[in-house]
Swiss-Prot record:
The presence of a 'disulfide through disulfide knot' structurally defines this protein as a knottin. The cysteine framework is VI/VII (C-C-CC-C-C). GO terms for cellular component: extracellular region. Belongs to the conotoxin O2 superfamily. The keyword Cell division does not apply. This is Conotoxin Asp7/Gla(3)-TxVI. Expressed by the venom duct.
Length: 73
């Protein structure tokens, strides 16, 4: 009888730990499956100024224009 009680307690502990681990998995999957920026996107973010930053040529503003010394959208 005592062995049966111990076996049931061990089974209950294992099931509860499995349930706790499964609760954490969806968050990890969401984080893993979320869109990550490519190296090119990270590089462009570093190279491209804000659209209000000063400039002297349009190529300094990436996809914006340089007008009156500032990047314009």
């Amino acid at each position: 009888m005592q062995k049966l009680i111990i076996l049931l307690l061990v089974a209950a502990v294992l099931m509860s730990t499995q349930a706790v681990l499964q609760e954490k998995r969806p968050k990890e999957k969401i984080k893993f499956l979320s869109k990550r920026k490519t190296d090119a996107e990270k590089q462009q973010k570093r190279l491209c100024p804000d659209y209000t930053d000063p400039c002297s040529h349009a190529h300094e503003c990436c996809s914006w224009n340089c007008y009156n010394g500032h990047c314009t959208g």
